[in-house]
Amino acid sequence: MELKRVVVTGLGAVTPLGNTPEETWENMVKGVSGAAPITLFDATNFKTQFACEVKNWNPNEWIDRKDARKMDRYAQLAMASAVQGVKDSGLDLDQVDKNRVGVIYGVGIGGIKTFEEEASYYALNKEKGPRFSPFFIPKMIADIAAGQISIHFGFHGPNFTTTSACASSTNALADAFNLLRLGKADVIVAGGAEAAICECGVGGFNAMKALSTRNDDPTHASRPFSASRDGFVMGEGAGCLILEELEHAKARGARIYAEMVGEGESADAYHLTASHPEGLGAKLVMEAALADAQMQPEDIDYINVHGTSTHVGDISEAKAIKEVFGEHAYKLNISSTKSMTGHLLGAAGAVEALACVKAVSEDIVPPTINHDEEDKDPEIDYALNYTFNQAQKRAVRAALSNTFGFGGHNACVIFKKYAE
């Protein structure tokens, strides 16, 4: 059967750079850091005392007050991004066949703050007998964001959550893409959300020695591909892409941001938390996405890298890019928007895919900020264009986004300019 074409017709985002996709993109292009001292809890005694938090967050701008109280922060962020995306798409909710509209969101951890609060309450009061909120489980579970969005809009199409650590929302986009091109839905609200900036989240990653401890200079802490990088900066947020079958989008006169043309998945099969030192999984996933899109390496102008600002991860991804793209690796642009947003964990792929869509539609590549010192490891290879410290205008025919998760999960998606 002939596969259908899939386009992006709406965007939504709540990130450390802004509470809308427009504000997020504007600050991304400007090279603004979202890092600051933690305000969501008292981090005085933690090794890491800063993060990339969503600022000025008021869920009631997007969600009914009564409903918001029944949601963990991650689900609130997810809902806000979906509301924005659906509005931006111009979907007529009275006319669209809601049986053919789905919701797929990627979530890496889910309601960790809800779990933390309930466990703490139980520990302090267990002598009185077990007492838990009836909303404990529905607020905590990772699938509830997709469910809440579906309920809010009355969408009856495919509805589920993908969980593959930091690759979660890229897998959500990939699953949505495949369902649409197979004709199993007309529209899918696809994205991801995460809100793990809490004692358990920061403490857990600190215990793994995964986080930067640059407490005296948070805004310069996330520095992918720079010699002095010392770990990732935790972020939170949500991103949404409205993916739509092309003929359905054309029939309703929808604005089209870009076309989604390929996706890939692979596994490192190497280590629970470390990427393969030779970039094997990264190489395989990019090759898979290019093959799926029926594109050559030379067709890609921009790679939004996983680029978390860890020593091994940045090196292995650079190796993989050079192996897959050959000489063309030196002609395209590479950047890590995590240098600005921090690592949004399960939401990273959705927000970074949004950055790729905007790069394709506006012909500008956001920067990798905070670079001030070259790494001595030759594999980083500074002949590559990492788009250091300042956005670059260029023709972006197609953009590729990488996300890699604990457990060796790798996912990749490709977007290109839409043409008839």
What are the roles of these predicted feature ranges?
Residues 1-67, 89, 247-259, 354-368, ...:
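ACP-dependent fatty acid/polyketide chain-elongation machinery
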Residues 1-8, 95-98, 293-299, 330, ...:
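Flexible, low-complexity linker/loop segments at domain and module junctions
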Residues 5-9, 36, 216-293, 302, ...:
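Condensing-enzyme catalytic core mediating Claisen C-C bond formation in acyl metabolism
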Residues 8, 29-164, 193-204, 297-313:
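Conserved beta-ketoacyl condensing-enzyme motif
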Residues 22-27, 112-129, 179-182, 202-215, ...:
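A glycine- and small-aliphatic-rich helix-loop capping segment at beta-alpha/alpha-beta transitions
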Residues 78-91, 145, 150-153, 159-194, ...:
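Active-site-proximal alpha-helical scaffold in enzymes
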Residues 123-133, 174, 178, 194-251, ...:
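Glycine-/small-residue-rich "gating" segment that lines the acyl/pantetheine channel
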Residues 270-279, 308-325, 330, 344-351, ...:
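Short glycine/threonine-rich loop-to-helix capping motif typified by GTGT followed
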